[in-house]
Amino acid sequence: MIILDFSQFLPDIGSGFIIGFVIGWAAKKAIKVVAFLIGIYILSLLYLAKIGVISINKEAFSALLGNLENSLLVFGDKIIGLIHSFSFGTSFLIGFGLGFKKG
């Protein structure tokens, strides 16, 4: 009969969860700050365009947003590959999810 001592796995599980929670919480806070700054920037551009100080090339702006979307998708794929390479990936993902939810 094989007796398994689960206490040897606790440091990996616990550290993965804690690291995931902190990174998830920080990621959500960072996303909120970046979204706020982008919103302020876009609003300032729209205001300047409305009063005639600048002119916005709508086609180039749409292309820029499309390129940004593709870049974010590629970055997301790389992050997923990185998470899968962690030995404590499951607890990391659970911690990340909870940290993201709480952040």
UniProtKB/Swiss-Prot annotation:
<dbReference type="GO" id="GO:0005886">
    <property type="term" value="C:plasma membrane"/>
</dbReference>
<feature type="transmembrane region" description="Helical">
    <location>
        <begin position="34"/>
        <end position="54"/>
    </location>
</feature>
<keyword id="KW-0812">Transmembrane</keyword>
<feature type="transmembrane region" description="Helical">
    <location>
        <begin position="79"/>
        <end position="99"/>
    </location>
</feature>
<comment type="similarity">
    <text>Belongs to the FUN14 family.</text>
</comment>
<dbReference type="Pfam" id="PF04930">
    <property type="entry name" value="FUN14"/>
</dbReference>
<protein>
    <recommendedName>
        <fullName>Uncharacterized protein MJ0067</fullName>
    </recommendedName>
</protein>
<dbReference type="InterPro" id="IPR007014">
    <property type="entry name" value="FUN14"/>
</dbReference>
<feature type="transmembrane region" description="Helical">
    <location>
        <begin position="6"/>
        <end position="26"/>
    </location>
</feature>
<keyword id="KW-1003">Cell membrane</keyword>
<keyword id="KW-1133">Transmembrane helix</keyword>
<keyword id="KW-0472">Membrane</keyword>
